[in-house]
Amino acid sequence: MNKLYLKYFKLLIIFTMIQILILNEVMFSAYINPFLYILLIIMLPLKTPKWFLLTYAFCCGFFIDLFSSSLGFHSTATVLIAFLKPSISKITIPHNILGENDEIITHKIGIKAYLTFAFILIFIHHLSLFLIEHLSFNFNILIKIISSSLISLIIILITQQFFYRNK
């Protein structure tokens, strides 16, 4: 498990840099803000200790907040999905197909289960993030939540296929 922790802290640095230096700087449209860093929370094994999952989620969100000047919005949304991840996995991921330290990837759980699991977490993240950020809800924010969630899912799938194509 210690190797896993070390791996994920290295990935945290890489994904934070990608998010800050590339994704936050590219203007997709007024309605699309993709967030790749939440892939780290999605991929963590189901048997990850809760203390690590929540602490790691806070660190992920904190670093994005720190470099984006976003006052804790990302930390809040990321800790929320980390907290909900075990419950959502029980509903969306078939039982007994993952080993104790298996990462949650399409090759392990299947594309249908992965899309369902990942989209629910991504949607909850974006919903909470944009509602907290805007402190209101209207049609434009709904479009922003849905479009950002879909684009984030596509970017996450592409990234995952790139990293795990040979496994």
Enumerate the predicted regions with their spans.
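Terminal, non-globular segments
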Residues: 1-167
